[in-house]
Amino acid sequence: MSLMDPLANALNHISNCEGVGKSVAYVKPASKLIGRVLNVMQDHGYIGNFEYIEDGRAGIYKVELIGQINKCGAVKPRYAVKKQEFEKFEKRYLPAKGFGLLIVSTPKGLMTHDEAKNQGLGGRLISYVF
């Protein structure tokens, strides 16, 4: 069996583990995109440390959960967003203005929608977390 969207599967698994009160989530398969999304989430205080574990296949991320995530998920389809259009997607995916993050893939790498707005960049929506 193959996964159609490993990022959506990983974020759903993290959200479910957080919901039942687990302190650690094991995300597999690991990928560079999932690692970069976890890095943004860690920088903004939604998860604790995470580490890559080699298992001889695709690898596993061990993610420490700290009880800060209410919901997280992947955005499908991955909308192309101009720098002026972030507010429309904030209203769609986040519960309130200034609460939560949209994670955006820009030409300068993965970053939050606020960082992209400040730098005047557009990109593709990857995921949300609040």
Swiss-Prot record:
Q: Which GO terms describe its biological process?
A: translation
Q: What are the alphabetically sorted keywords of the record? A: Ribonucleoprotein, Ribosomal protein, RNA-binding, rRNA-binding
The terms under GO molecular function for this entry are: rRNA binding; structural constituent of ribosome
GO CC terms of this entry: ribonucleoprotein complex; ribosome
Q: Which InterPro entries does this one have?
A: Ribosomal_uS8 (IPR000630), Ribosomal_uS8_CS (IPR047863), Ribosomal_uS8_sf (IPR035987)
Q: Which Pfam families match?
A: Ribosomal_S8
Q: Which domain of life is it from?
A: Archaea
Q: Which family does it belong to?
A: Belongs to the universal ribosomal protein uS8 family.
Q: Name the job this protein performs.
A: One of the primary rRNA binding proteins, it binds directly to 16S rRNA central domain where it helps coordinate assembly of the platform of the 30S subunit.
Q: How does it assemble?
A: Part of the 30S ribosomal subunit.
Q: Which PANTHER family match?
A: 40S RIBOSOMAL PROTEIN S15A
Name-wise, this protein is Small ribosomal subunit protein uS8
Q: What is the lineage of its organism?
A: Archaea, Methanobacteriati, Methanobacteriota, Methanomada group, Methanococci
